[in-house]
Every structure is written in C-alpha cells, then in structure tokens.
C-alpha cells in the first residue's frame, strides 16, 4: 500500500519537476524509509466535484502501485488541462511520468 500521510510535500516540491506535461507535474526524491510514498495534489479550483477528484486520485495511486517497494517520495500535481473523463489520455500521461521517475531515481 502506498503511503501518503507522512510525506513532506514542500521538501519534494522544492526540487525541479522530474517530468511535466499538459496534464501533470511529477516530482520525486529518494527517501530513507524503504518504501514509496505518494502525494497527490488536485486543486479544488480545477475539479470542483469531490467525487471526481477522488476518482482521479485512485487512478493515480493505481498507476504507481508497482513502485511500492522503491524508496522514493513522489508528488503528482494535477495541472487541470486533461479531460477528467478521458481515462486513456490520463493513463498514458501517468505512464510517461512513471517511466521518467524510474529512470531518474535508479
């Protein structure tokens, strides 16, 4: 299970983004916890409905489950240009970010 309760967003975001596109910004740093911690930021101004925000958070968490055993902190920031109902576009965007995070943290 990916943990997010004790991640320090400011520490991770203080670095440059690992990857970015029109949908998301992805930040990551190595940690000494031995497990992956994932933080997700979806501004209320971008997606008003809480149910839709939570659906998107579940999709993001699901995409990063395979990194669970990695010792990295990841923060994903939604930029608000993706159509929230276009699952294929969101999924391909998250795959792109995951690939870049894996490449830079090895």
Which functions belong to the PLM regions below?
Residues 1-106:
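Positively charged, solvent-exposed patches that mediate nucleic-acid binding
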């Amino acid at each position: 299970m990916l943990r997010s309760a004790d991640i320090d967003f400011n520490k991770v975001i203080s670095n440059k983004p690992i990857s970015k596109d029109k949908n998301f910004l992805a930040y990551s740093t190595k940690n000494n916890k031995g497990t992956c911690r994932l933080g997700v930021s979806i501004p209320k101004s971008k997606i008003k409905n809480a149910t839709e925000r939570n659906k998107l958070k579940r999709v993001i968490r699901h995409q990063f489950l395979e990194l669970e055993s990695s010792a990295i902190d990841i923060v994903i920031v939604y930029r608000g240009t993706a159509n929230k109902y276009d699952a294929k576009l969101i999924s391909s965007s998250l795959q792109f970010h995951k690939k870049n995070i894996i490449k830079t943290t090895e």
